[in-house]
Amino acid sequence: MDITELLAFSAKQGASDLHLSAGLPPMIRVDGDVRRINLPPLEHKQVHALIYDIMNDKQRKDFEEFLETDFSFEVPGVARFRVNAFNQNRGAGAVFRTIPSKVLTMEELGMGEVFKRVSDVPRGLVLVTGPTGSGKSTTLAAMLDYLNNTKYHHILTIEDPIEFVHESKKCLVNQREVHRDTLGFSEALRSALREDPDIILVGEMRDLETIRLALTAAETGHLVFGTLHTTSAAKTIDRVVDVFPAEEKAMVRSMLSESLQSVISQTLIKKIGGGRVAAHEIMIGTPAIRNLIREDKVAQMYSAIQTGGSLGMQTLDMCLKGLVAKGLISRENAREKAKIPENF
């Protein structure tokens, strides 16, 4: 079985990931659970050959030098995949994350009107956060697609690697892949300010320099979308501020309070009857929220979100209650993800 057959099988099963690991049969993750494919275990040289076949020379060199590498790979007519190849105690390994070839719209994903309102802001910082595999890329792709269909703007994305490919519809879209089209996030962001973008997507705000440049871009009149691995709006503010040295924290709080438009923290939950659905905590940069950021009163944010329902804000628990009421998720699954489980 070659790699394209394995990937086609994986996509057909609706898997989010295909795992190849020397010494074990191939496995797929479906609806959050890792399951074995009914095939014999793969030897190290088989796994090594499967991943080497789809790498270019630079990726092979990286893999040999650093013992791991990231790249993207497309099976025409099936999907694109984000690949991480690595070594483990039994030999070679690789994980293929499925990137659906079709960008789903906000309507198809069941995203409310508030997401359109957040996308429509002319400038500022919009952060979509959550753990790995929580659907951040899918949410952001839908928001960019909405803008691509409704505005005459220049959208510039900086990703590692490029996940969803956006055609230029009403917007001009330029997508840059780290290590292929640019040396790094901070380098690409620095030159982005001279590339006349209206909207900038920063695939990952990993380090101080990238976060600083994203804040500067938002402050200078661009709409900047970024992602972090935080699990709530309050933790997101802390994470951004904590990256900076003590003497800069007050200045960063001030910058954030002026430029932050929204924080959307999401998680995926198993649906009744199969599949998964996203649950969101949504914080909007209202005057009250901006004040809390400026005065370092992050602990009071949760209650400000609770009382901001009329403005489109919601806590994760409010969202979970709505999903339970619609019959989409079970109380048990809601309880697992809830901030206050006894409410379920």
Swiss-Prot record:
- List of residues binding ATP: R82, G133, S134, G135, K136, S137, T138
Phenotype upon loss of function? Mutants retain surface pili but have lost twitching motility. In a mouse model of acute pneumonia, a decreased colonization of the liver is observed but not of the lung relative to the parental strain.
Would you tell me the Gene Ontology cellular component terms? cytosol; type IV pilus
Q: Which UniProt keywords apply?
A: ATP-binding, Cytoplasm, Fimbrium biogenesis, Nucleotide-binding, Transport
Instruction: Report the record's Gene Ontology biological process terms.
Output: pilus retraction; type IV pilus-dependent motility
Q: Where does this protein reside within or beyond the cell?
A: Cytoplasm
Q: Gene3D superfamilies from the xrefs?
A: 3.30.450.90, P-loop containing nucleotide triphosphate hydrolases (3.40.50.300)
Describe what happens upon changing L292A. Answer: Loss of motility
Family label: Belongs to the GSP E family.
Its function, per the record, reads:
ATPase component of the type IV pilus (T4P) that plays a role in surface and host cell adhesion, colonization, biofilm maturation, virulence, and twitching, a form of surface-associated motility facilitated by cycles of extension, adhesion, and retraction of T4P fibers. Acts as a molecular motor to provide the energy that is required for T4P retraction while antagonist PilB ATPase activity is required for T4P extension. Also promotes PilU retractation activity through direct interaction.
Question: How does the annotation summarize its subunit structure?
Answer: Homohexamer. Interacts with PilU.
Kindly provide the name given to this protein in its UniProt entry: Type IV pilus retractation ATPase PilT
* Gene that encodes it: pilT
